[in-house]
A protein has these predicted regions:
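Hydrophobic, helix-prone linear segments
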Residues: 1, 16, 34-35, 165
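Polyanion-binding surface elements
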Residues: 1-21
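P-loop NTP-binding core
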Residues: 4-6, 37-41, 46-262
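Major-groove DNA-recognition helix of helix-turn-helix-type DNA-binding domains
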Residues: 17-41
Length: 262
């Protein structure tokens, strides 16, 4: 006889997901967890529908667009709202890692471990920020050569994240490049969040970003048909100054690209 789903107390489900009981109750009320109420207490159905983990890559090959700042601030704000957040630093310059106060990173703590073993390294828990981080270091530069030597290696992070169920959101800070390491981060998630500096430089950079996004989407079609057809999910204006006509023209240009990033 087939065994039906059993009920899990809110406290136990909170411990499993690594979030607070209040957050579990909120997810129940929002319809993101299937649950039943027995008397005064809620119970989550084991095997019921759970909100899918969302993963996005902050991506642009143009430096100075505010990509890393956005990754940090989005991660912090989501964590502040009660979501379980993992940040992944894929840039050997390790600016995100440094800004979060993480020092003395060992190679096995970075994505170098992923490329060697196929497994994510254990993340660092940042208590002050209430989020987790897979840090970067200069050692990560060695990954570029390893990725060039292995077919389909740029899908390693995507594959590993599909097994990761502890987080509501994964935010990946890509390096300003169009190389293999950038592709590893770009193809790992559910699409790209693209910061666009409101300047001529920012608009010019969009051409390369859109070409790269199209190439990534075509590559994913062969192995991940569930990937969204529109791979750029959002353009985020940065360094905007409402007092300048140039910035306002660029902002209008970004707004006109809704078909590319609805």
């Amino acid at each position: 006889m087939e065994e039906g789903p059993h009920l899990v107390p809110v406290s136990e489900m909170a411990e499993r997901l690594g979030i607070t009981r209040e957050r579990v109750r909120q997810m129940i009320l929002e319809g993101k967890l299937e649950a039943v109420r027995l008397g005064r207490y809620w119970y989550v159905r084991q095997g019921g529908k759970t909100r899918l983990r969302q993963a996005y890559t902050l991506f642009t090959h143009a430096g100075g667009a505010g990509k890393t700042s956005l990754a940090r601030d989005l991660g912090y704000e989501l964590a502040r709202r009660g979501f379980r957040v993992l940040l992944i630093d894929t840039d050997p310059q390790a600016n995100l890692t440094s800004w979060l106060g993480v020092r003395e990173v060992q190679p096995q703590e970075t994505l170098l471990h992923l490329v060697k073993t196929g497994q994510l390294p254990p993340p660092r828990s940042l208590k002050d920020w209430n989020l987790d981080l897979i840090p970067a270091s200069l050692d990560l530069a060695r990954v570029e050569v390893r990725l060039m030597q292995r077919p389909l290696a740029t899908l390693l992070l995507r594959t590993a994240l599909r097994k990761e169920e502890r987080y509501d959101f994964v935010l990946i800070d890509s390096l300003p490049s169009l190389g293999h390491l950038a592709a590893l981060g770009a193809m790992a998630g559910d699409g790209l969040l693209v910061p666009v500096e409101t300047s001529v430089k920012g608009v010019e950079a969009l051409v390369g970003v859109m070409e790269a996004a199209q190439e990534y989407r075509e590559a994913l079609e062969q192995v991940a048909p569930e990937a969204p057809k529109t791979f750029v999910r959002l353009f985020i204006p940065t360094k905007y100054d409402a007092r300048t006509s140039g910035d306002n023209r660029v902002l209008e240009k970004i707004a006109s690209l809704r078909e590319l990033a609805p």
